[in-house]
C-alpha cells in the first residue's frame, strides 16, 4: 500500500513539475517530496530483498533505523508548512492583504522540516552506530528500527504530535474562515474543489495527530496504527493527485481548454494554495 501511494505521488509530482498548465507552490511540492522520501525510507529492505531470511545488511539496517524515526517528523513538518501556506492564501483572499512574510517566513516553513529531520536522523544514526544491539528488524520484517525502551519512538511521536497540533489549530482557523466567508471566497476566484480538499486534508491531519499520540502512550501503536500510517501516502495521492488540471495533463490527446481569466484580486493574493 505504501509503495502504491509513493508511486502515485511520484507520478503526480513529476506531472506537476513538467506540465506547463499545472502550477503548484513550493509547499505543495515539498509535501509530495517528503511523502515519497518517507515511502522509500520504510521500504529500503524491500528494495534490496532483505525483508525475510537472514539478518539484513548491518549498514543498511542502521541507516534505515535512523530514517524511520526521523521521517515522521518531516511529514508532520511539511504538513504544517502546507496548511500554514493555505492559511496565508485564504487570509489574503478574505482580507485583501498580501500573504504574511511572503518570502522569509515561507522559506522558513519549507526549510525547517528538513533541517529538523536531518538533525534527528544524524542523532539517531550516531546512537544506532554506538549501540548496534538496539537495532533490529521489526516483527513483520518490514523495516529496521531502534529498540531502546521505546525512547526513539516517543521522541519522534512527541515532536510530530506538537507539529500536528499546530497544524490542526491552523486547520480549524482555515475552516472557520471558509465557513464565514464562503461567498466572498467563491467570488474571489478560489475554486470550490479547493475547499473540499482542505477539509479532507484537515481530516487526514487530525488522524495523524491521533496516531502520533497513540505511539507516545503505547510505544508503537500496534499493527492497526502501522496499517493506517502506511495508507497515508495513498490517501495523499488521492487527495492531491485527482485535481482537474493534473487529470487534463494526463489526457494529452484532448485539446487544451481555454484559460479562464481570474479576478485581479484572486490573481494577486490567493494564487498557489492547494490547487
Protein language model annotation of sequence segments:
Residues 11, 224-271:
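Seventh transmembrane helix
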Residues 78-88, 169-183:
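Membrane-water interface of transmembrane alpha-helices
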Residues 173-216, 232, 236-239:
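Intracellular effector-coupling site of seven-transmembrane GPCRs
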Amino acid at each position: 500500500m505504501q509503495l502504491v501511494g509513493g508511486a502515485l505521488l511520484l507520478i503526480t509530482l513529476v506531472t506537476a513539475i513538467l506540465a506547463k498548465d499545472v502550477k503548484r507552490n513550493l509547499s505543495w511540492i515539498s509535501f509530495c517530496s517528503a511523502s515519497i522520501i518517507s515511502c522509500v525510507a520504510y521500504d529500503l529492505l524491500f528494495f534490496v530483498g532483505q525483508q525475510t531470511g537472514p539478518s539484513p545488511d548491518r549498514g543498511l539496517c542502521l541507516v534505515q533505523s535512523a530514517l524511520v524515526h526521523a521521517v515522521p517528523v518531516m511529514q508532520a513538518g511539511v504538513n504544517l508548512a502546507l496548511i500554514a501556506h493555505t492559511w496565508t492564501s485564504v487570509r489574503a483572499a478574505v482580507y485583501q492583504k498580501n500573504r504574511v512574510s511572503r518570502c522569509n517566513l515561507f522559506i522558513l516553513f519549507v526549510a525547517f522540516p528538513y533541517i529538523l529531520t536531518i538533525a534527528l536522523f544524524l542523532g539517531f544514526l550516531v546512537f544506532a552506530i554506538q549501540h548496534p544491539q538496539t537495532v533490529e528488524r521489526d516483527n513483520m520484517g518490514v523495516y529496521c528500527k531502534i529498540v531502546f525502551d521505546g525512547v526513539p519512538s516517543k521522541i519522534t511521536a512527541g515532536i510530530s504530535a506538537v507539529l500536528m497540533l499546530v497544524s490542526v489549530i491552523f486547520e480549524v482557523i482555515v475552516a472557520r474562515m471558509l465557513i464565514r466567508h464562503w461567498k466572498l471566497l467563491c467570488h474571489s476566484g478560489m475554486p470550490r474543489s479547493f475547499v473540499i480538499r482542505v477539509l479532507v486534508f484537515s481530516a487526514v491531519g487530525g488522524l495523524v495527530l491521533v496516531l502520533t499520540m497513540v505511539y507516545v502512550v503505547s510505544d508503537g501503536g500496534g499493527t492497526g496504527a502501522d496499517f493506517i500510517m502506511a495508507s497515508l501516502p495513498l490517501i495523499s495521492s488521492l487527495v492531491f493527485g485527482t485535481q482537474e488540471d493534473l487529470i487534463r495533463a494526463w489526457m494529452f490527446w484532448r485539446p487544451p481548454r481555454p484559460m479562464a481569466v481570474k479576478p485581479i484580486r484572486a490573481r494577486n493574493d490567493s494564487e498557489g494554495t492547494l490547487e
